[in-house]
Structure formats: structure tokens, C-alpha cells
């Protein structure tokens, strides 16, 4: 049909009057325009329209083209058609239907001003006119104007199901509840469009009670469509009711209802955002989801696969399946997928994350700011700044040097890698800084124990401090023993409502007071807290009780910790065992360890890392799993022998007291992972050209013990080198028999 239509000689048609043009030909012309539009050739349709006789340029033809422009967001052709129509008044009368098409076209194309002008000049309007403009405001993000227009509409005509569903799309709880009530009054609540919109509206409130109101609406719907199910799952997900969301999904699946990409994305979000799910439930559901995505073919969609990767990595810490899934995506891996897998490994396996970043570059993909941010997080988990320097160069080459977020990430990475000078250089070179920039620099100084530098930086801060700012300041004062300065900063937080102390600030103050052996004041702060102390507070107190041998308060903190984090956390048992050991109560210490074994609680393995010749070497206490174990032991033995001549005496309080053989007890103490790492670095340094390097860097996953701290101080004097150690709390700069922490850590 369209071929014959396009071949019509319009010159021949013009010789006939409009009276002789059959209405069938006019309908055929309109249908021909629609066919061209459906085939994606809107330009040809518009060209054909302009070259047609006036008699064929009917209101139906205009309407068809306005609708096409709306669907394809073609504002330019829409405006030209509107001008053409106004310049041919015999083609256009004040027609409500045609004006509605115009409003819809302008609204869909994002020009809400023109849509409003058409609406305001209409001599009469119907429900479609109001709905089209309301929808336009909502889609443009101007929900307030849309709701005001809806309120005005009620004095002119009744809304229909499409009006209500459009208004509900942007409503908050109170106005949304009123619209829901109106729907019930008008009998429009039975409409699937209205019901779905009501469910979504309640879900957006992020409130459990509202989610159950959505559930009531959901259960009342007799014939649910896929959008209904997805809306209910999304509502529970938004309200952090993951278990409920999964329950809806399971029911949906058992009822034989199909699912789509939106379903799977909402369920994945439910799994890693909700706090009401236990690991076993997450694991079971994740495996089922993975199976369903494979069977349905949706696993080939990048967003779905990336969401699954996030669940595997963040919730299950199952990096094997996470990586396997990523490798199966070889045909559809975009930058979002790469960002997901790099982020997954950034904390768990930083070296793998760096390797993945290298693979991304080999595949000729251009990293975005999120990629660089994730890989810099991985750099922060490595021993040295070597990789951070390389990524920094690529950030500059990629044109991201002015990006504040990336500069903040660079400061964090360099600080964690021990390069405080590079942190300062990045900070000083920044064109603009936000509060995170200042906080990152303050945290860097705090991490390295530079309390004399942190306070001047804080005084120069030209942005209002936030909660994290005071955490950095209080932590620095705590680790440096600057109690009075710390208390002054803490008291200043009460001066403004926006800086009132939160749990973490109280934890810092309690840590600061108890480190200084001011336990009575620490107890008083706990009693005066406006909220219940959390695990962080009791852990801070427990650590200092161990250091100063306060058994009574340590027992209280350990018991509170067990109540809060369940008896499966190793911290309370180990710290109490150490406290009992220190005071010579070995039976009580052993009972604490046996209680830990009864609950099958596993202690975090003691691991250390050092980098030699661009290769990272890992050490576990006792040197297990290393082929060069005997050689490292021999080197360590030599070091210990020399250090004992310098006055080193093993601190037996740091040894495990459940070993009956005293010689074995000392042997166990001397084979802590950081000592092995140092011995290896010394041994390898003699073999390589790096023997003249005056810095040895070691990273440790737990807090350094008293004995190892004493050992490192003397070793720095013996070797004539600086030993830079990062433990779970902070950096220790050992040099000439002293430490930057002044033995206060």
C-alpha cells in the first residue's frame, strides 16, 4: 500500500477538488504515514506530508506525525509541524484532540514550557489534556507543579486511571495516601495501572509500615501482571525487607509467573541491601537466581550479571563463583561489568583487582572515574605505593586530574601505602577541595601519628567539618595520648546541632581515655551517652583494659561484646585471655580459650606481607606453607641473637599460655608473622641490588603485639634502616630504636 501511496502524483490530485477526494484515500494517506514511522523513517513521512496536497494534510495526519515525534523524542520536527499547522488555519481549528497530541509531544520531548503554552490557550480541555500535562511535569522531575495541576484539575473534571497512576508516580506518603483514597472513592483502585502505582508509591517511602500497606493493595488485586509483582518486590527491597521480597519472588515463581530483567535486579538489590537475611538464605537464593538467569538467557544482560557479581562478592564473599560468572560474560562485558568485578576484588584480593584492571586495558576499554576509584581502593590494600603511582599516571593521562573524587581516592591510597609525602602533594595540587578531601588528609596524618600536623590542617579547613572530620581528629588525639586536646575537640562538637557526637565519636573518646588509663572517666562517658553503646565502644574499652590489666572492666566489656555481636566473635575471648595471662591467671585464660572453642569460634589468622622485587610475599605465624621456611628461620635466629646482645628480652605476656613447654612458648612468640617478614626482607635484600635501600615496608592484618613492637624498634637500630609497618590500627615508623607512636598504640 505504501509503495503505491508514495508514487501518487500529487499534481494530478490537485486538479481535483477536495470534494472528489474519497475519504478512503485520506485514510490511506494517514496509514501510509504511520507505516513509514513504524519502519523508522520519520523523515520520509514528514517530507511526504509536506509535499502532499492541502486536502490530504488533515488533522488525523497531523495527529499521526505528532504522535511519532513524541515516541521518537523528535522535538525539531514536532516544532516545524506545529508552525506549519498554524500557518495553514484551514487545516486547523481549535480541536481538543489535536491540542492533546501537541501537549503530549512537547511533554515527551522535554519542552514542558511549550506544552504548558498549548494547554493554557485551549478554549476547552478534557481529562486527556490535564493528564498529558501532569505526566509531562512528573517526567520532567517537577513533581510539585504536577501535583498542583492535579489539584486544580479536580475542580474542572474527574481524573481517570492514567491521571492517578501518573500522579502517584511522584507522590510522597501523605499526598500519595490522599490520592489512594480518591482512587477508592472513584472506584479506580481496581485498575491495574492505579494499583501498581499505589504499590510503588508506598514502596518509595522506605518505611516498613508503608510496605505493608503496599502488600494489602497487592493482595487485593485479582489479576496481577508482571509489573504488579515487580512493584511489590521493589517495595519490599526499598524498605530493606529482603526476606519479604524473596518470599514474593518465590511465590511468583511457584505460580508460574514469568520474570524479567527488572525482577532479577530488584531481587539482587534485596539480597545485598537488606539486614534481615542470614548468609544461608542469601546463598540459597543467589544460587537459584543464578540458575534462573542462565536458563532464561538473562545472564547475558550485563546489568543482571553485574548485579549477581555484587551479591556473590559483597554478601557471600564467594569470589570464586563471582569471578567464574564474570568470565562467562566474555561476550557482553562492558565498563560497568569490569567496574563490578574490580570493586569485588578491591578489598578481598587487591592484587587480583590490579590484574583485572590490566586486563581491562588490554581489551582496549577506557576506564571511567568509577574504575579508577575502585582500583585505587585496591592499591590502598597493598604494601607499597608502586601500583598507586602507576594508576595516578593513568588518571592524569585519562584527563581525570581535576576530578575531586579521584584526588580524594589518591590521597587515601597513598596514605594507606605509607607515602604521606605523596598525599600532601596531591592535596596541595588540588584546584578544588570538598569536605572529603580535607577529611582524607586529616585521616592520613592520623594514620601516621602526625598529630602536630593534623591540627594546623584542621584550622586551615575552609569548609564546615562533618562527622568524619571529628573522627579523624579524635583518633589522632587518642593514638598520640593528647587527651586534653581530644576532650576540648569533643566538647566543641556540642556547640552546633549538625556536629553533635554520634556513636563513633563516643567510641573514640572512650578509647582515648582508657588508653590513658583514665578508666573512671571512660565509665562515666559510657553512662552519660544518649544512646546505647555499640560493639565498637566495648572493643575500644576492652583493648585498653588488656594493655593496662584492668580485669574487672575488661570482663564487663567482654560480656557486653558477646551480647551485642553474639558469642561467635573471637575478639572478646582473645582479649580476655590476654588480660588473664598478663596478670598470671592462666586457668581463667585457658577457660576463655576453651569457651571460644566450644562455640567453634575461629581466630583471624595472623598474616604479614612485604614486597621484594615487585613481588608481594605473604607470611603466617609459624612460617607455614612457605617453601623457604627453614632459610627464613635461620635468618630470624641470627637477628634474634644479635638483638638479645643489644638487650632484647622476649615479652612472654604476648605468648600463648596454653603451651606447657616454656621453650616452645618462646619459639611460638618469636615466629610471629611480622618477624618472619622482616627476616625475609633482610635475607633477600642481601641477595639483590636493593641492599642499599634504607626502607623496609611490612603490612599486617592484626594489631602488632608488644613483643614484636620492641623487636622492630631494636631491629631498626641494628639494621640501620627505617621499618615502616602498617598494622590493623595505624602506621609505625621504626627508626633508631624508637617508634613514631611513642609506644602509645
Curated annotation (Swiss-Prot):
It holds the Pfam family E_motif. Gene3D superfamilies: Tetratricopeptide repeat domain. Residues 537-613 are annotated as: Type E motif. GO terms for biological process: RNA modification. The keyword Thylakoid does not apply. The keyword Repeat applies. PPR repeats lie at residues 58-88, 95-125, 126-160, 191-224, 225-259, 260-296, 301-332, 334-367, 368-402, 403-437, 438-464, 466-496, 502-532. Keywords: Repeat. Residues 614-644 are annotated as: Type E(+) motif. This is Pentatricopeptide repeat-containing protein At1g71420. It comes from Arabidopsis thaliana.
Amino acid at each position: 500500500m505504501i509503495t503505491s501511496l508514495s508514487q501518487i502524483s500529487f499534481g494530478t490530485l490537485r486538479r481535483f477538488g477536495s470534494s472528489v477526494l474519497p475519504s478512503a484515500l485520506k485514510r490511506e494517506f494517514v496509514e501510509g504515514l504511520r507505516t513509514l514511522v513504524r519502519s523508522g523513517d520519520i523523515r520520509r513521512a514528514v517530507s511526504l506530508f509536506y509535499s502532499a496536497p492541502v486536502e490530504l494534510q488533515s488533522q488525523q495526519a497531523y495527529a499521526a506525525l505528532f504522535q511519532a515525534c513524541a515516541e521518537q523524542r523528535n522535538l525539531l520536527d514536532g516544532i516545524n509541524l506545529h508552525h506549519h499547522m498554524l500557518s495553514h488555519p484551514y487545516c486547523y481549528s481549535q480541536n481538543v484532540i489535536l491540542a492533546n497530541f501537541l501537549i503530549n509531544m512537547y511533554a515527551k520531548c522535554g519542552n514542558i514550557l511549550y506544552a504548558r503554552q498549548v494547554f493554557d490557550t485551549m478554549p476547552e480541555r478534557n481529562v486527556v489534556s490535564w493528564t498529558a500535562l501532569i505526566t509531562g511535569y512528573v517526567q520532567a522531575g517537577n513533581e510539585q507543579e504536577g501535583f498542583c495541576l492535579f489539584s486544580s484539575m479536580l475542580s474542572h473534571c474527574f481524573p481517570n486511571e492514567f491521571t492517578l497512576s501518573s500522579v502517584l508516580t511522584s507522590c510522597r506518603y501523605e499526598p500519595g495516601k490522599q490520592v489512594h483514597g480518591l482512587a477508592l472513592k472513584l472506584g479506580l483502585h481496581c485498575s491495574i495501572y492505579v494499583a501498581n502505582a499505589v504499590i510503588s508509591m508506598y514502596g518509595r517511602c522506605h518505611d516498613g509500615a508503608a510496605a505493608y500497606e503496599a502488600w494489602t493493595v497487592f493482595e487485593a488485586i485479582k489479576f496481577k501482571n508482571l509489573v504488579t509483582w515487580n512493584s511489590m518486590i521493589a517495595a519490599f527491597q526499598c524498605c530493606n525487607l529482603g526476606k519479604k521480597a524473596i518470599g514474593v519472588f518465590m511465590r511468583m515463581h511457584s505460580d508460574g509467573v514469568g520474570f524479567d530483567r527488572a525482577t532479577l535486579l530488584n531481587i539482587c538489590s534485596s539480597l545485598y541491601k537488606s539486614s534481615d537475611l542470614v548468609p544461608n538464605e542469601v546463598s540459597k537464593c543467589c544460587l537459584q537466581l543464578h540458575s534462573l538467569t542462565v536458563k532464561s538467557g538473562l545472564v547475558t544482560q550485563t546489568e543482571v550479571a553485574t548485579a549477581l557479581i555484587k551479591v556473590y562478592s559483597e554478601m557471600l564473599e564467594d569470589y570464586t563463583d563471582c569471578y567464574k560468572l564474570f568470565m562467562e560474560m566474555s561476550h557482553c562485558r562492558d565498563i560497568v561489568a569490569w567496574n563490578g568485578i574490580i570493586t569485588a576484588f578491591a578489598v578481598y584480593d587487591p592484587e587480583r583487582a590490579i590484574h583485572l584492571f590490566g586486563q581491562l586495558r588490554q581489551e582496549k576499554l577506557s576506564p571511567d572515574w568509577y574504575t579508577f576509584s575502585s582500583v585505587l581502593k585496591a592499591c590502598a590494600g597493598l604494601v607499597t605505593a608502586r601500583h598507586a603511582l602507576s594508576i595516578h599516571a593513568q588518571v592524569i593521562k585519562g584527563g581525570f586530574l581535576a576530578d575531586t573524587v579521584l584526588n580524594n581516592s589518591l590521597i587515601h591510597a597513598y596514605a594507606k601505602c605509607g607515602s604521606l609525602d605523596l598525599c600532601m602533594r596531591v592535596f596541595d595540587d588540588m584546584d578544588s577541595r570538598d569536605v572529603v578531601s580535607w577529611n582524607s588528609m586529616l585521616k592520613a596524618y592520623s594514620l601516621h601519628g602526625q598529630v602536630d600536623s593534623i591540627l594546623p590542617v584542621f584550622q586551615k579547613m575552609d569548609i564546615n567539618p562533618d562527622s568524619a572530620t571529628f573522627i579523624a581528629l579524635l583518633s589522632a588525639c587518642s593514638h598520640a595520648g593528647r587527651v586534653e586536646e581530644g576532650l576540648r575537640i569533643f566538647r566543641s562538637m556540642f556547640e552546633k546541632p549538625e556536629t553533635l557526637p554520634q556513636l563513633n565519636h563516643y567510641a573514640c573518646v572512650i578509647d582515648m581515655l582508657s588508653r590513658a588509663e583514665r578508666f573512671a572517666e571512660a565509665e562515666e562517658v559510657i553512662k552519660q551517652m544518649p544512646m546505647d553503646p555499640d560493639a565498637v565502644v566495648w572493643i575500644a574499652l576492652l583493648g585498653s583494659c588488656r594493655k593496662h590489666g584492668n580485669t574487672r572492666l575488661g570482663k564487663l566489656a567482654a560480656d557486653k561484646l558477646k551480647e551485642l555481636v553474639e558469642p561467635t566473635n573471637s575478639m572478646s575471648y582473645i582479649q580476655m585471655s590476654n588480660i588473664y595471662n598478663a596478670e598470671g591467671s592462666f586457668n581463667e585464660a585457658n577457660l576463655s580459650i576453651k569457651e571460644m572453642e566450644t562455640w567453634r569460634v575461629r581466630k583471624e589468622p595472623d598474616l604479614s606481607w612485604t614486597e621484594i622485587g615487585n613481588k608481594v610475599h605473604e607470611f603466617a605465624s609459624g612460617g607455614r606453607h612457605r617453601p623457604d621456611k627453614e632459610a627464613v628461620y635461620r635468618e630470624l635466629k641470627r637477628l634474634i641473637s644479635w638483638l638479645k646482645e643489644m638487650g632484647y628480652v622476649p615479652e612472654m605476656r604476648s605468648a600463648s599460655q596454653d603451651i606447657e613447654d616454656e621453650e616452645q612458648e618462646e619459639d611460638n612468640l618469636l615466629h610471629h608473622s611480622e618477624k618472619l617478614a622482616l627476616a625475609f626482607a633482610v635475607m633477600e635484600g642481601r641477595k639483590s641490588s636493593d641492599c642499599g635501600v634504607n626502607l623496609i615496608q611490612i603490612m599486617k592484618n592484626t594489631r602488632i603485639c608488644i613483643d614484636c613492637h620492641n623487636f622492630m624498634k631494636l631491629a631498626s637500630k641494628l639494621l640501620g634502616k627505617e621499618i615502616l609497618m602498617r598494622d590493623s590500627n595505624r602506621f609505625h615508623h621504626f627508626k633508631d630504636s624508637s617508634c613514631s607512636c611513642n609506644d602509645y598504640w
